[in-house]
Each structure stands twice: as structure tokens, then as C-alpha cells.
Amino acid sequence: MLLTSISHSGMVWNLVTGQQMQLPGRAADLHRMITRDNRVDLRDAVAAFCTVSKICMLDGVGRLNLAAQRQASPLNEAPTSHLQALFMDDSRRSRLQQATKEAFGSYVLIDPTTPGHFKFCLADELPRHPDLERSLTNEALEYFSKAISMEMASDGVKAYSGIIAAVLSADFRVFLIDEPEAFLHPPLARKLGLFLTRIAGERSATVLASTHSSDFLAGCVQSGTSVCVIRLTYERNIATARVLPADRLTELMRDPLLRSAGVLSSLFYRGAVVCESDTDRAFYGEINDRLQRFSKGGADDAIFLNAQNWQTCSNIIKPLREMGIPAAAAVDLDVLLSDDLSKLLKAAFVPPITASGWTQTRARIKAAFQKQLKPGDGSPELSRLVKMVGVQGLTGMDRDSIEQFLNDLSMYGLFLVPVGEVERWLPELQIVGHASRWLIPVFEKMGSDPRDPSYVHPGQEDVWAFMRKIAAWIADPHRKGIPS
């Protein structure tokens, strides 16, 4: 619903419905309206409060009507709808037209040619002179007769135009908007976020929006206006609320790696799996999809992201976990050969004392690999061998130690590939190669039609067990590795 801040004789107009209601003169009167449920609709009471406070509230019910035709009132009185308010103000109407032209290539105009009503219409060109928009001359009648009625427009055009028109119709100081991205395709949602935050910045106003759209949020951040995100979750009877401050959000959006990885989209998922490369991301995503379709244990509502290598995985999982998103890392086993494992432990919020001990364990495991594999030419050769043989490259107590260490790491959402590297999964397919030269043949062998006898269904071991373990950590409300 949307209400004008103009009142007369103690009455206000609901700009969406066009109906009058009594405006409470004091806070106590407003309180009585809210508590007197059997006599006054609660929505009316909230609407009255919004009017007094210059609040623009656009909920799901009222927003659907914003592009509809409205009845006109005497032009020398206060406007009774957002259409009439814009019709009376050339500057606001011009801004509406420019906003819609930039968004979808058409100007939104207010057609006054239907007696007693105002309605929106669309045109490719503006009238020859501004006064034509507010006249009923033959030229005006001909112009509007050629315009396209808003009733013929898509729901996205109606929704976008209605919200912009409502926002511009009065000098609101607070905007309350429920799911502003409804009916909008991604680019339009981004443009709406950009427009709303710019308006808020110009007026020193505040936009409070509940959204499930990373595109809308990206548009808000793009405006340069201070944007703060509060991420709310409710799962297994546990509610959480985490704040992502404006400076941190801006930092995330400016980082090319995080921006290209789609980190902002992760805000709208229950969990994330961060992989070393796009090949890993595509493969593990397919494994998870098949688990969800044909078995149990897949990660529900999880997004799969890729870094550039395992060293940059820490740059992604840390900010996600700070936002309360359980972000698991799936990396190749050769991470154990590098001192940089400490960065991954820090990003996973492993306690410092524990991390210190694990750093020493890593060094011992590396020494064990060097002793048993006997690489010929140093670290590059050792890395190749470790990724080729996995944990099976160690025997006896060394094998027990590395398996226990991998289990310890998994408790903090760090999952190292026990077979060495992603290309070693599903050995029964007998695919040799690396990156895309491996991935494409693997997908072909796995099949795309579940009815085909050769289609690869989930099993109990190998990569299927690995992904189930990742999914279990993401789903566990008592998981380790998420800062309080």
C-alpha cells in the first residue's frame, strides 16, 4: 500500500485503493486503531502510521495494483492517487519517463483522456511539447490514441513502472518494499535496486527491502550508496540474523575474484561449496544433482562456486562464513604439501591452537609422502604423485594418520579429495585427461537420460560418499567453522 503525506480535514487518501480514511491525531489514537481489531483493519492502521511518518510501504498485495487505472479527483484538491500526483508534477513525471526509457526502452506516460480517470500508457517517443501531456486537445487525443495501454504490457513492465511511480509520487523518507524483484527479469531487478538506492541517497532516505534477488542487491551496491545486508535464516527451529556492514559489502563487490565467483548470490542459499576450478564446480554440482534426484544425502539448496585455485578458496569461504553461510571447500589432496594450508585453516575459523597443531601434522604427512613416494625432481613431481595415488600412497600408521587428519579437517568444512584430485573420481569410467579434456568425456560417459541403461546413478562409495559428507556438514546446525 502507498499513502500520500498530504491530508485535509483529518483525512488521508490511500493512493493504491483511492479510498479515504480518518487520520489519527495522536500516537495514542493510532495505538487504539491497531488494538481495536474488530473495528478497524490492521492494514488501515499501519497505513495511517506510514502516512504520518512519510513512509512508502509496498507489500505484495498493493504492489500488483500500482499500474492499474485510477479515478481522478478535482485537480485543485490533494491528489488521491500516485498517478494524479505525478500528473500534477512535471518534474516527477519527467523522471519517471526517463527511468522507464532507460530500463526497457519505452516512456511511461499518464493518459488523462478517459473522463474521470488516469491511466498509464507506453510510447516510444515523448509528446512534441510537455504541455501536450496535460491537455485534451485534438493533438493530445491523437497522441494518446497511438500509445500502448499499460494493460497490454508484461507483468515485469507493470511492476517496475508501478514501483518507480509510487516512489516518485511524494517525498517519502522511508521505503518498505517486500520482494521488489517480483515479476522482474534479472537486469530489470538490478536497475530497480540502482534506482531505489539513488533516490534514497538524494533524499537522505532509507530503503528497507526483503529480497531473494542477488541482482536487486547488486544494483543497490552499484549505486555507491551505503548498503547494509541483514541475512535472516530459520532452519530446524533455529533462527539467525547476521549483519554484513556496508563497508564489507562494498569490499566484496570490488574484489574481482569474489564478484566473478558469484559470492553475492550465495546470500540467498542455505550453503555453498567452493571448488578449485570451474571443472571441479561443474563436476561436483552434477554429482550433487544426481544425489538429490535419485538418492539421499545431497546438499539441499546449495550453490557451487569456483575459485582460481585452491589457494584462493580461502578468499571466498571466509567472507561467506562471516555472513553465516556454511561454505565448504572441496580441494585436491596436494594442499597438504604447502605451507599455505594455514591460510585455509584461518579462513575456516579453526581455533589457533588447533591450527598450530595441524600445521605440524601437515608437515609430517608431507615428509611421509616424500619418504614413501620418493619423488625424483622435488615439489612439482611430489605434487603430481600425490594427486595420482591419493591417500593410498601411504601405508601403515602413516595411512591411518592422514585419514584421521582428513576427517578432522572435514569437521571444519574443509574436504580434501582422498583419491588425490577430481580427475581420479569414478575410475570405472576409464577417462584420462585433465580439466575440460577430462570433464566433457566424463559427462558423456555418465549419460543424460536416466532411462538409458548406461546412465550413472549414485553409488555408496567414491565421489558419492565424498559429496554426502559435504552435504552433511552444510546441513548440520551445530557444524564447526562458522564464527558466532
Briefly describe each language-model feature range.
Residues 18, 23-28, 33-35, 129-148, ...:
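Charged, glycine/proline-rich intrinsically disordered loops and linkers
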Residues 78-83, 141-150, 182, 247-248, ...:
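Short, basic, glycine/proline-bearing loop/turn elements
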Residues 13, 75-76, 106-108, 260-274, ...:
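Acidic, Mg2+-coordinating catalytic modules of nucleic-acid enzymes
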Residues 41, 45, 54-159, 165-169, ...:
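Extended helical coiled-coil dimerization/tether regions that scaffold
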Residues 1-81, 297-300:
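Electropositive, glycine-dotted interaction segments
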Residues 1, 128-265, 463-465, 472-484:
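Switch/communication elements of ASCE P-loop NTPase nucleotide-binding domains
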Residues 97, 193-197, 217, 317, ...:
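Short amphipathic alpha-helical segments and helix-helix/interface helices
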